[in-house]
Amino acid sequence: DGAYILNLFGDIATELTIRVDGDEGLLRAYDNVEFISPVYAGDFLLIKGKVVKIGNTSRKIGFEAYKIIESIKNAKNNSSCKILDPPILVAKASGTTVVLKDKQKC
């Protein structure tokens, strides 16, 4: 669901700010959040994030979530899945993180 995807985007934001700044920073806001395709229990997601702009203390991040494996609703075998090729874009967003100047790595 949407809250689950936003939580995963937050995890990616934390990883990216640690990689860039050596500090997890604070996710200040999401903007332009779009939920494009439904996600169901049993689906597997690939989450991508990229720092697209670095300011003095702010970092703008673009996020995308793709469904890569889909659960098949099958009465005979409730654990059936299929690989999606190509993956399906299910959500995208951008967000801003803030890392205080004294917390940034040199």
Where do the language-model regions lie?
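HotDog/MaoC-like acyl-thioester-processing domains
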Residues: 40-44, 52-106
